[in-house]
Design a protein with these regions (language model features):
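Conserved active-site alpha-helix within GNAT-family acetyltransferase domains
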Residues: 99, 124-142
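Glycine-rich acyl-CoA binding loop
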Residues: 94-102
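Acetyl-CoA-dependent GNAT
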Residues: 2-80, 84, 89-90, 102, ...
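Short glycine-rich hinge loops at helix-strand junctions in the catalytic core
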Residues: 96, 113, 137
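Active-site acidic-Proline motif in GNAT/NAT acetyltransferases
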Residues: 89-91, 95, 124-125
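Conserved beta-strand-loop-alpha-helix junction that forms the acyl-donor binding cleft
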Residues: 119-129, 147-153
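Conserved GNAT acetyl-CoA-binding A-motif
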Residues: 109-121
């Protein structure tokens, strides 16, 4: 059984580790050789503190009786809610846990008056996440973030959009 439960402080250390792993995974998508360091965990703790602010909801993902990840919802204003981050421990992936967690998050968001849509931010290299979100009906492009690297650029893949080449 998969269930979202509101974050509880007793899971702080494990949640900080998962947040650090989440960001480390995203770095690895760019082939960056980043390692988890003490500062990774300090930054993860700061992130956790931000996620506990009133305009956010943080849920732990439970599978059977174990916590296996987290899901973070942000309410930025207006009628759009954001599933800001979702993370499932590596050993529990491809078991439908993220799919069910997103569906449960959609129901949570629907329970708040005034929200008419849900958005995700996803890095283009995270193909697994893109396929999952698309499968769940997230097939409308909204805001596109364009970026200019001021220093070395490790982005070596190209995607065409409106006839223009964009690195990712």
């Amino acid at each position: 059984m998969i269930k979202l439960v509101p974050y509880a402080a007793e899971f702080k250390d494990d949640t900080i580790k998962r947040i650090a792993d989440f960001y480390h995974y995203h770095s690895s998508l760019l082939n960056e050789k980043a390692e988890l360091t003490e500062s990774s965990y300090v930054e993860a703790e700061e992130t956790l503190e931000n996620w506990l602010e009133p305009s956010h909801e943080l849920y732990l993902i439970k599978f059977k009786q174990s916590v296996v990840g987290f899901l973070h919802i942000g309410y930025r204003g207006g009628n759009v809610a954001w599933i800001e981050d979702i993370y499932v421990d590596k050993n529990y992936r491809n078991k439908g846990i993220a799919t069910q967690s997103i569906r449960d998050a959609e129901e949570i968001i629907k329970s708040h008056a005034g929200y008419t849509s849900i958005c995700f931010d996803v890095v283009p290299r995270n193909h697994e996440a893109l396929r999952l979100y698309h499968k769940l009906g997230y097939d409308n492009l909204s805001i596109i973030t364009v970026r200019k690297e001021l220093y070395e650029n490790n982005r070596d893949k190209i995607e065409k959009l409106m006839g223009l080449d964009f690195k990712y």
